[in-house]
């Protein structure tokens, strides 16, 4: 996590000395030791302090020092190499969404009501699909019942992230079934014998990939019965938008009907 301490800024070398302090009396609020938020706080706070001491706009100071797309892949001074990213473009998008240009007017309006309004800015970066260099696998199993309902068993459990919706959409796009026909089983060790879990922005990358592979195996497995029903050969069968089709003909059958 210390590798994130240089953030998304053009810093090719750095020297870092970290001192940890244990306390049960946080001056703001308790937070779990995730690592990236702490690293982000350090670099972003340093930029705010530098901007104040230099009499420089804190947004402009960030913008001037962001890693640019043409510098990718960018090797940071600590641990990581960023493979891609448009950090300047993302900053502009965020500023527009937050109406940065209109902040002074909002601050004055708040001041007239004896209120204090502030504007915080930070550019965090997160490992997705980690751990870095060795992403863990994820379990998935897809079964289809005779009535056309689809049951997905996942080793990655939902704790508020909305897995059921995302997973159903993935299967829907691959198999051409209605998302409402997909039911999810997770957190049941009798059904899912193993699983890595939900953390570190990995679920869609890892579990989603496993689900896609399950769907692809299922589609390929069903090609032979599709060929039999359509009185064709496997080589002539293609699958698209939820239908098995005989090439160069109008013969087809939906995945659900099959």
Language-model regions: role of each:
Residues 141-151, 234-258:
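C-terminal, non-catalytic interaction/recognition modules in large multi-subunit enzymes and RNPs
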Residues 30-72, 144-150, 162, 170-181, ...:
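Long hydrophobic segments that form regular secondary structure
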Residues 28-53, 74-99, 195-229, 250-258:
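Glycine-rich and small/hydrophobic secondary-structure elements
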Residues 66-149, 169:
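Helix-loop-helix junctions that connect adjacent transmembrane helices in secondary transporters/permeases
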Residues 128-192, 197-202, 206-211, 215-219:
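Catalytic phosphate/nucleotide-handling subdomain of diverse soluble enzymes
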């Amino acid at each position: 996590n210390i590798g994130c301490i240089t953030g998304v800024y053009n810093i090719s070398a750095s020297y870092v000395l970290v001192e940890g302090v244990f306390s049960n009396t946080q001056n703001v609020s308790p937070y779990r030791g995730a690592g990236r938020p702490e690293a982000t706080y350090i670099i972003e706070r340093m930029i705010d302090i530098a901007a104040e001491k230099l009499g420089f706009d804190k947004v402009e100071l960030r913008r001037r020092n962001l890693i640019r797309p043409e510098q990718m892949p960018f090797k940071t001074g600590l641990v990581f190499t960023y493979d891609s990213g448009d950090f300047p473009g993302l900053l502009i998008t965020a500023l527009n969404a937050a109406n940065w240009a209109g902040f002074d007017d909002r601050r004055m309006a708040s001041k007239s009501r004896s209120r204090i309004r502030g504007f915080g800015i930070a550019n965090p970066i997160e490992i997705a699909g980690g751990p870095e260099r060795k992403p863990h696998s994820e379990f998935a199993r897809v079964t289809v019942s005779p009535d056309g309902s689809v049951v997905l068993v996942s080793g990655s459990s939902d704790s508020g992230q909305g897995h059921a919706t995302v997973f159903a959409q993935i299967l829907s796009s691959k198999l051409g079934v209605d998302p409402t026909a997909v039911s999810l089983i997770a957190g049941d060790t009798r059904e899912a014998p193993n699983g890595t879990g939900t953390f570190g922005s990995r679920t869609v990358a890892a579990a989603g990939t496993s689900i896609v592979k399950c769907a692809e195996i299922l589609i390929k497995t069903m090609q032979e019965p599709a060929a039999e029903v359509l009185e064709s050969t496997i080589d002539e069968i293609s699958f698209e938008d939820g239908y098995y089709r005989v090439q160069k003909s109008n013969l087809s059958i939906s995945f659900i009907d099959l």
